[in-house]
Amino acid sequence: MEMYETLGKVGEGSYGTVMKCKHKNTGQIVAIKIFYERPEQSVNKIAMREIKFLKQFHHENLVNLIEVFRQKKKIHLVFEFIDHTVLDELQHYCHGLESKRLRKYLFQILRAIDYLHSNNIIHRDIKPENILVSQSGITKLCDFGFARTLAAPGDIYTDYVATRWYRAPELVLKDTSYGKPVDIWALGCMIIEMATGNPYLPSSSDLDLLHKIVLKVGNLSPHLQNIFSKSPIFAGVVLPQVQHPKNARKKYPKLNGLLADIVHACLQIDPADRISSSDLLHHEYFTRDGFIEKFMPELKAKLLQEAKVNSLIKPKESSKENELRKDERKTVYTNTLLSSSVLGKEIEKEKKPKEIKVRVIKVKGGRGDISEPKKKEYEGGLGQQDANENVHPMSPDTKLVTIEPPNPINPSTNCNGLKENPHCGGSVTMPPINLTNSNLMAANLSSNLFHPSVRLTERAKKRRTSSQSIGQVMPNSRQEDPGPIQSQMEKGIFNERTGHSDQMANENKRKLNFSRSDRKEFHFPELPVTIQSKDTKGMEVKQIKMLKRESKKTESSKIPTLLNVDQNQEKQEGGDGHCEGKNLKRNRFFFW
């Protein structure tokens, strides 16, 4: 209620009050029905039933429910405000409504009733007070507190419904198997009142109403007479037998001829003999003079005009239009899902690392000659490696194993993705072990370092640890383009290491010739303390087994062990690896 300003009380009933309020933001006048707070469940049942029907069914001639909320344990229903009813019209026109106005009102009321009946809904409380009339002449059926769905065979309804004056004889006799005809009976009584200005069957009790029905309309049917005779309420009561004219216009002389026919068709004692709402809409009373064709455009224009004035109420779309829009939304949604799924699959394919192509190039020439490696083209066709490499002496049978990276690296960015060194990242040229020469060839130190995602050979996989692969550079290490001074220094380092590797290999041969008793106390030289010192223990056991197998086959073939020596170990070896004032972190390869 904070959003509404109370203007006054409109009405009050047995179940609650209706307040006239104004929306503070839009200024629209609304009617708020407030249900009483009572311990019994009947009030909540009626309120929830009305909410259910108003949310489920929408029609031009049904009152619009704007919102529902609960405050202080009271249910509040907010409706569009129409403070005028048919009863107010009858109080203004004491002798009844004029014929043109009456036909327009009745046509709209029948449209609302036919809409409910087509959805198997019975209103059960049709009367002049529940027919709202707007300033432009649009009628709307309201008060769905007693409305309910049509019962299945064998089900029963509430016995007390509808206002007494408009109650059908089956309701008066408390027949629980009633249906849609009760609304048609109430409509017939209301038509007479709207045409004459006086209620047709005013009564003070059910017995009084039943007596007037027999006098003005007709005698009870055999089924209703049986219920009447067995009812303890009417025990000892005898109803009169009256002969009524069969002609409708003689029976209702105060009514217009066609209107009298409609009333006669509505007020039939037997519910099965009453006319339906759809047949009433096609009655001659509405079809003559092209009334429907002329009035419908006028009605549509008035509805659109009211929809513009009422900011909180939007014009309802037809069910077919809603279905078409829902189908369009579903189609757009499914197309969006399909496109997104296809795009996701393509992205996943691009994310998968491509297979590494290993190209073996035979090198011809002498021991000190080696041909320049061919320029590699990445699969993306973007990057190429510089063909100028440092030359190291190799045997004529040596084969170069070229490992290409799975993804091309932009030369404008470094290994960490920073724009720095154009030579950072690329292919790595790694010579395999020469089995015919005891001197083991080291990898080209000036070539680019291993990429973390490069796939190594099977033997290299076995030697790799979980923390860092052999020959892999730490993420923060940098690689710069080697100069001529650096290449000369590296040649000296390489010659020094080859001699050191021969000495280490000879020591391994001697150690393998020990006796079994000595082997039990055999200790390998301790590895330098690195990040992977814990994991190299398991690697040493595998190397021992591998060396034993190779020693049985041939004593000339030895397998090197590559160790990653950190920067501190480099400094102890005499300052190797310094490059004209710049301290560079490099990978050292020990052979022993």
Curated annotation (Swiss-Prot):
It is an enzyme of class 2 (transferase). The modification Phosphothreonine is found at residue 158. The modification Phosphotyrosine is found at residue 160. One of its GO terms (cellular component) is cytoplasm. It catalyses: L-seryl-[protein] + ATP = O-phospho-L-seryl-[protein] + ADP + H(+); L-threonyl-[protein] + ATP = O-phospho-L-threonyl-[protein] + ADP + H(+). Keywords: ATP-binding, Cytoplasm, Kinase, Nucleotide-binding, Phosphoprotein, Serine/threonine-protein kinase, Transferase. Residues 368-379 have a biased composition (Basic and acidic residues). It is found in: Cytoplasm. Pfam families: Pkinase (PF00069). ATP binds at residues 10-18, 33. Residues 4-286 form the Protein kinase domain. Gene3D superfamilies: Phosphorylase Kinase, domain 1, Transferase(Phosphotransferase) domain 1. One of its GO terms (biological process) is negative regulation of axon extension. Its EC number is 2.7.11.22. The active site is at residue 125. Residues 466-477 have a biased composition (Polar residues). InterPro entries: CDK, Kinase-like_dom_sf, Prot_kinase_dom, Protein_kinase_ATP_BS, Ser/Thr_kinase_AS. Residues 368-390, 459-485 are annotated as: Disordered. A motif ([NKR]KIAxRE) lies at residues 44-50. GO terms for molecular function: ATP binding; cyclin-dependent protein serine/threonine kinase activity; protein kinase activity; protein serine kinase activity; protein serine/threonine kinase activity. Disulfide bonds: none annotated. The [NKR]KIAxRE motif seems to be a cyclin-binding region. This is Cyclin-dependent kinase-like 3. It comes from Homo sapiens. The lineage of its organism: Eukaryota, Metazoa, Chordata, Craniata, Vertebrata.
